[in-house]
């Protein structure tokens, strides 16, 4: 089987590519100015080819924060109901978000996710399924293992810390808080042919927890040991 080409090789329009770059530049200014985002682990990101990026979910800013943490273009999933709310719906559609059913069971979303992974792109998912109620890593839902198995791409674990302090679920608007992102070593399914889905779920959970602990410790050092 031929190796997947880098994501930049695919035929998005010039307008689409320029819009993505503009939004990335704008969001980067926001993230650096308001959230002092710091990222560790760039060396773990595959230089080319598809990868499934799995991250914890602390707040509504997470897709932006993870997207900015990678130098390659990032695809992300969004509930189909969000596309009906203008201007948010138009914005996420313009950024090539993949619509999924509210319960995450839609075949069209799964097929599009697999298509983008197999053509060599990065796709971000939040396997916890919803935002954390207290900022900690919640139990992962097993659905992402199907995507990983069918695509055969590496799984890249990522952890965010500080998003919960910036915008917890019970707060209407975001606030200022330093953000730390930790990118972990990719999990290669080609080396785990004898691992079943339950064991894979445990492995991914352990790797994400390791990343989360590193991100939390690094953020605490930046904040003088305080959670702010």
For each predicted feature, which ranges?
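Non-catalytic C-terminal accessory region of glycerolipid acyltransferases
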Residues: 1-18, 108-228
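A transmembrane-helix-recognition feature enriched in membrane-embedded lipid enzymes
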Residues: 2-41, 47, 72, 85-95
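A generic secondary-structure micro-motif detector
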Residues: 16-20, 77-78, 102-103, 133-134
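Hydrophobic alpha-helical segments typical of transmembrane helices
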Residues: 18, 22, 26, 62-65, ...
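Short, basic, glycine/proline-bearing loop/turn elements
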Residues: 26-28, 94-100, 127-131
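Catalytic core of membrane glycerolipid acyltransferases/transacylases, capturing the structured
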Residues: 32-33, 45-104, 112
